[in-house]
Amino acid sequence: MSWRNNLRDVEPYVAGEQPKMSNLIKLNTNENPYEPGEKVKEAIQSFDPFKLRLYPDADASKLKHLIAEYHGLEDDQVFLGNGSDEVLALTFLTCFNGQNPILFPDITYSFYPVYCELFNIDYKTVALDDAFKIKKEDYFNKNGGIIFPNPNAPTGELMSVDDIEDIIKHNSESVVVIDEAYIDFGGETVIPLLKKYDNLLVIHTFSKFRSLAGSRLGVALGNKELVSHLYDVKNSFNSYPIDALAQVIGEASIQDSEVIKEHAKKIIATRERTKKALKEMGFTMTDSYSNFIFIHHDDYDAEYIFKELRKKHIIVRYFNAPRINQYLRVTIGNDEEMDAFLDAVKEIIQAS
């Protein structure tokens, strides 16, 4: 059969497990434990299904305007896609086709190398330091583009805006993409830097902070020319990526922002309480600024804890990968879920 040779060897991204078991505490895919705001629920209830017979607004104009207004930008600085994964894929295809390899951390979002293999993009992974932090100087070398999450995933470590700005300054001929999927759980966004740098692109998602993982809404924010090129590529694939109901839900979510910020505060408080309890059990962890924690115990195998938790219907994320195969990534759920998680971990340790 004749098809593109590079596609034969692509190893697709493996998404977090979505188990169907009952009485499940699901702490493996960084979903928000709280419901979307009331305006989202009202928007869904009042949506006229007769509208689904028509194609949606291809530009998602109202949603785009609300997002731009929320971030203090112009409408034509906003790119919308069907989830941030689609936005990232189109970003790789649009921005990372130079002669030099692109750079991203060795421990990061595992979709990045998949995009590179899929689109035949040369890349080089840059090792995090022993504390799983990004060293800005490692990104001052010649490259065809740079991308990393901030906070990073799965470590949760946060890089300062000043350090990111240094990277942007040293790479004026490359596009620097900052994936801010988790920025609203304690970090500082680099969006204000868009006023100073044309080579910066910022990726956001409605999945985490806004509790809309099931609706699939992703955003890229950048200078007008860069965003225009993203739309050129997107429209060569699909002119209608945001369905009509998702647009209405997204609009309502922006209007619900103050309520959602209170949910984020709850998650942060629960995260810090959980970290304290785990430290008392002998766990160590990274300085997570996200809605998850990345934990390790010197005396207990991570995969063993992962499997024992599963027996108790608690699902966390285990990565069988170099440097991190003795760590677990644990999504921060609500207080009841995290109490059950802590009790289960204590039982596992005491029984070992």
Give the residues covered by each predicted segment.
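N-terminal "arm"/small-domain region of PLP-dependent enzymes with the aminotransferase-like
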Residues: M1-L54, K142
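Phosphate-binding glycine-rich loop
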Residues: L52, S61-P101
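PLP-dependent aminotransferase-like
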Residues: T94-P149
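Active-site phosphate-binding strand-loop segment of PLP-dependent enzymes
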Residues: D129-D184
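PLP-dependent enzyme catalytic core of the Aspartate aminotransferase-like
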Residues: D162, E308-K312, R317, A321-S352
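PLP-dependent aminotransferase class I/II
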Residues: N199-K279, F283-T286
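Conserved PLP-binding catalytic core of the aspartate aminotransferase-like
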Residues: I268, E280-K312, L328
